[in-house]
Structure formats: C-alpha cells, structure tokens
Regions:
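Alpha-helical transmembrane segments and their immediate juxtamembrane cytosolic regions
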Residues: 1-368
Length: 368
C-alpha cells in the first residue's frame, strides 16, 4: 500500500523546486529544503527496494530513472551538436551521468539542475554497501557525511563535486534509511545493539532508537546550529541555503527529523498521484522551460521581475509543463512497468454484469 503522506511530501518538494527556480525566493530553501527531502524520500524507497529485491534493486531503480532522462537527452544533445558543440566521448555521459556531461549555449543553463540525477545515481550505486553498514553501525554511519562536510567547510577544501554532494546530501539519504527501518518513530522498538533482521525490521523488541528518543533535542540542536551558521556565513544570495552547504545540511536534517518522524493519515487525491507519477518529468523539463520563457520575455520587453513578471512567468511555465507531461510523461509509466496513460490516477471503468434470470440458470444447470 502506498504511503500517501510520503506522496504528499514528494509532491510538495516537486512544486517547491519549480517555484524556487521560477522566482529565486531564498526563503523557500529555509521553509522547505526540498532537495534534501527528495533525497531522504529516495533513500527510504531505496532501502525498501533492497530489502525486497536485493542488489537487483539497483538495476530496477536505474531502469525507472534513466528513460525519462534519455527523452530529454534525445532533444538536447542533437541540438547542441548541431549548434557547434565539439564531439567528445564525455557526451556519452548524458546517457549515464555519473559525472557532469558537457553542455553549451541554451542548454548550459537549461540542464543546470542535472546535478540531482548525478548525485542520485551515485547514492543508488552505493546503497547496497551503505545499507548493511548503516544497519551494523547506525550512528557512526549517519555522522560520517556530516563530519566530512564540517571538515570540508572548515578547511576550505574544494573536493570533486560528487564528493562534496555526497557529504552534503548523504545524511539526508541515510535518514531515509532510518525512516524505512523505523528509527525515527518512538513506536518502533529496536533491539539491543540496533540489530536488524530481514526487511530491516528489529530482531527483538527493546527501546526506541536514539534518533527517536532524542528527536526533539536533535531537531533543536541541528536547527539552531544550522541557523546560526547561515546567519554568520551568508552566501552571495544572502540566506539562500543552496549557497551555504553546512547550514543547508544541518537545517535539512532537523526538517527531515520532523517531517519523517510523523505518519499522519492522508486521504488519496488524484493531484498527488499525478505529481508523483510525473515528478521526474517535471524536474527534468522545468528548468529548460523557465530559461526559455525568461529569454522570450527579455527579447519582447515583457516584465520578468516583480510580482507581475513572476506571476505570469510561473503561470506560463506551469502550462508548458502540463503540455510536456502529456507529451512525454508516459515514459515514466513504461519505466515503472505500468500501463502508459496521459493523466495518471484515473479510475478504471468496469462493465456491470447483470444477473442472469433464474430460469436461465436452471436451464444451464440441466443442459448436458
């Protein structure tokens, strides 16, 4: 059974990302740290997949992720090559972007959000090793990415972008593991030593995990520390957490502990189904559409900034996204093994069967 609350969080994160990239409002990164929430939700789903399918879960997850990317690549890469981009073997990375592939012209900005897929691929590939390690040593494993980020920040080191992002978002992914294993809820009891059986469930009843018992203390410490660091180390755009990695990680951890530490009952809504079934398509295409709308506005003299500019741009981007979702969103259905539909969540029609007359039933029984 689907967890509609997690669907709600994923849908809210998707909408928040589109609104943030359309408006640039830094406050949104504080009110709802969407990227960390998306990584945490993905980590929880990855742990569930590994428990159910084993290492083959990696292939299944990639199978759901890559086809939608290839649709965008089939448009962007030929356009860039025809526009004069030099051929290089790194262009092939667009089909499996474990490192940033080359981009030029319009697509240099339009594909800027591809870092999420790059990091997602790395987390998926590392999860078969990370999940057993997390279950054997939960707290040390969880502290590792945060400790690495502190060292990177305080030393001023400039590691490879993948290494930096594994430190920045690795904690969120591992908190997703913790959510799947029930470590964020006081209702889930963990045996001595935090031992887990098959499916990541506790092997014997004991007491709530450390994360559950001290959750509100951790929320206070992490949130306060993240806020203080952000206020004393603002980035080029002020308090935009995307520019302040350490504050981003700490504040996001506090947010995730609150958001995933509860499990309210959410009624099913078709809007949630559509947003979740098309979340990847929306993410992949929203930045190119935003860039396109902004360039058209600048070329025609239409307002870009202020409430008027933001309102009409957001409306146009939403309409264009709806069109793209109708055109190529069904690829997500194929990748997930579902029957492709234009708009997910529709009820299946069944043909009512009228009861046969009693006489016909008796006649059928007496037939040879």
């Amino acid at each position: 059974m689907r967890n509609r609350y997690l669907d709600l969080l994923r849908a809210a994160a998707t909408v928040r990302v589109v609104v943030y990239h359309s408006t640039g409002w830094a406050a949104l990164t504080v009110v709802f740290p969407a990227m960390s929430v998306m990584f945490a939700l993905a980590g929880s789903m990855m742990a569930a997949s590994l428990d159910r399918y084993g290492p083959i879960a990696v292939e299944r997850r990639l199978h759901r992720l890559l086809p939608s990317l290839w649709v965008l690549v089939a448009v962007a890469v030929p356009v860039m090559l025809l526009g004069g981009m030099a051929w290089d073997w790194k262009v092939l990375l667009w089909f499996f972007p474990v490192e940033d592939p080359p981009a030029e012209g319009f697509w240099l900005e339009g594909l800027a959000a591809m870092w999420y897929l790059r990091d997602f691929l790395w987390f998926v590939l590392l999860s078969p090793l990370a999940l057993p390690l997390f279950r054997r040593f939960p707290l040390p494993t969880l502290l590792l990415p945060y400790g690495a980020l502190v060292v990177i920040t305080l030393s001023g080191a400039t590691p490879h972008l993948v290494v930096r992002d594994l430190a920045l978002y690795g904690g969120a992914w591992l908190l997703g593991f913790a959510h799947h294993d029930g470590l964020l809820s006081r209702d889930a009891l963990v045996g001595r030593g935090g031992r887990f059986g098959r499916g990541g469930r506790p092997t014997r009843a004991g007491k709530p995990s450390v994360l559950a018992r001290y959750r509100w203390w951790l929320v206070g410490v992490l949130g306060t520390t993240g806020a203080v660091w952000a206020l004393t180390h603002p980035g080029p755009r002020g308090l935009d957490l995307n520019d302040i990695p350490l504050a981003n990680a700490l504040w996001s951890a506090a947010f995730i502990l609150v958001a995933l530490g509860v499990a309210p009952r959410i009624a099913g809504r078709r809007t949630l189904t559509v947003l979740n079934s098309r979340a990847l398509t929306i993410y992949l295409w929203h930045v190119p559409l935003i860039i396109m709308v902004v360039r058209v506005a600048e070329a025609t003299g239409l307002p870009v900034h202020g409430w008027v500019g933001i309102t009409w741009r957001l409306a146009v981007v939403s309409v264009l996204l709806g069109i793209v979702v109708l055109l190529v969103g069904w690829v997500e259905d194929l990748a997930a093994g579902r029957r492709p539909t234009l708009v997910p969540g529709g009820s299946r029609r069944t043909v009512p069967v009228s009861p046969a007359p009693a006489g016909a039933v008796e006649l059928a029984r007496s037939a040879p």
